[in-house]
């Protein structure tokens, strides 16, 4: 190992010398790599925001096992099933409780701007804890009142005046699907790609927003398991006991994964973000290849001279790969810094969870290294054909 390090120290950094000799060409190359990195960072950031924002409610549900309709695709497209299945589920050994939850999209009028937008309405039993959101659990008495709701203060839109009124102890009235409601409290959950915010109230108030819905048709069944029982074991018992053509039994982890898988594989927007990452990678490969190919053509006589002096192809290839690694590392630095500001800008504009993570930075760095090494491998094909006899 020491001998290898000493050999590296004695070696002339020809790759760096050749790149730095043409500073304008180097700057163009680094700009291209940084652009490719920014494109990959932004697509991965949006993709993560897609998964994160659309699984927030799934992760906030207080349940060991979740019952849904087999026709349900995601949280924005939840079918209903009979509430009787909860009563049947309560008879299965290991089940501590089984509560219902109603979920649906409604059109609500922003009390401040008077503009209409889509928000997700949730109806739950105010006598039981259904969500792992302390702000909601502390205001269950408020939502027992007729037509009283609490609203998501992390919703997308202009609500500063509304939240100031509520924080001052005042109630705010507005319309939801042509019905007047009172907003008497707030909590924090966040917007998603499917809804600009969330309204929460009692199951009775929810059903008033949906007069055509039957109280016996629910969207979610929240099952809690007794101490000493494994959720997976109880879930298997529920699958055997309940008709699988009418209700689908999921553990908490499976319930979250179902939502994420929908946006990954079935949603067009998930495919678009993945395609964007691939396009960024290909743009980087093309840019780095053009730079390295131009460098090989410009110094083909020098490379032929090295061959005439007895240096093998491996030495010459090492120079090209040295250039590729230098370009990858130097190009990654601005490619990492710029998205930090863009993430903050996008998060403020959309209220979506867009932020940098260490894992994502390492992934893009690895992709950048692969991108540059791949470009170097393509560019070296011409180098191997450099023949001193043809040059001189």
List the predicted regions and their residue ranges:
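The feature marks short, hydrophobic/small-residue-biased sequence motifs that occur predominantly
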Residues: 83-87, 92, 96, 100-150, ...
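Transmembrane alpha-helical interface segments in multi-pass membrane proteins
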Residues: 280, 293, 298-347, 363, ...
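Membrane-interface junction motifs in transport/secretion proteins
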Residues: 35, 46-83
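Basic-flanked hydrophobic alpha-helices used for secretion and membrane insertion
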Residues: 131-132, 153-250
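C-terminal membrane-exit region of the final transmembrane helix in multipass inner-membrane proteins
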Residues: 354, 359-392
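N-terminal Sec/SRP start-transfer signal
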Residues: 1-40, 51, 56, 321
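Hydrophobic alpha-helical transmembrane segments of multi-pass inner-membrane transport and secretion
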Residues: 23-50, 266-304, 326-332
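Peri-transmembrane interface segments
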Residues: 231-285, 294-298, 306, 314, ...
């Amino acid at each position: 190992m020491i001998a290898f390090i000493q050999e590296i120290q004695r070696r002339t950094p020809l790759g760096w010398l050749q790149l730095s000799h043409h500073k304008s060409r180097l700057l163009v190359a680094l700009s291209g790599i940084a652009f490719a990195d920014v494109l990959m960072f932004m697509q991965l950031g949006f993709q993560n925001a897609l998964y994160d924002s659309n699984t927030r409610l799934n992760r906030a549900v207080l349940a060991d096992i979740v019952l849904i309709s087999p026709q349900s695709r995601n949280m924005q497209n939840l079918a209903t099933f009979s509430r009787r299945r909860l009563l049947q589920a309560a008879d299965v050994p290991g089940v501590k409780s089984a509560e219902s939850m109603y979920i649906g999209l409604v059109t609500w009028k922003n009390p401040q701007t008077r503009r209409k937008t889509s928000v997700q309405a949730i109806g739950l039993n105010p006598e039981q804890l259904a969500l792992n959101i302390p702000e909601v659990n502390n205001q269950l008495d408020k939502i027992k009142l007729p037509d009283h709701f609490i609203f998501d203060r992390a919703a997308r839109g202009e609500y500063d005046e509304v939240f100031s009124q509520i924080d001052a102890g005042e109630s705010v009235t507005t319309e939801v699907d042509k019905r007047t409601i009172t907003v008497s409290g707030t909590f924090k959950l966040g917007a998603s790609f499917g809804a600009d915010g969330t309204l929460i109230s009692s199951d009775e108030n929810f059903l008033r927003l949906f007069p055509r819905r039957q109280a016996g048709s629910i969207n979610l069944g929240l099952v809690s398991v007794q101490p000493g029982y494994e959720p997976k074991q109880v879930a298997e018992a529920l699958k055997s006991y309940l008709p699988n053509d009418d209700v689908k039994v999921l553990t908490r982890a499976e319930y979250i994964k179902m939502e994420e898988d929908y946006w990954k594989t079935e949603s067009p927007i998930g495919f678009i973000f993945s395609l964007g990452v691939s396009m960024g990678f290909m743009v980087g490969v093309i840019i780095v290849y053009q730079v390295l190919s131009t460098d090989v053509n410009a110094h083909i006589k020098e490379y032929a001279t090295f061959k005439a002096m007895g240096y093998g192809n491996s030495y010459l290839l090492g120079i090209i790969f040295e250039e590729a690694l230098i370009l990858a590392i130097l190009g990654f630095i601005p490619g990492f810094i710029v998205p930090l500001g863009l993430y903050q800008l996008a998060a403020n504009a959309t209220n979506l969870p867009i932020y940098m993570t260490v894992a994502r930075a390492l992934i893009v760095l690895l992709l950048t290294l692969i991108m540059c090494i791949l470009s170097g491998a393509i560019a070296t094909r011409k180098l191997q054909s450099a023949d001193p006899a043809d040059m001189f």
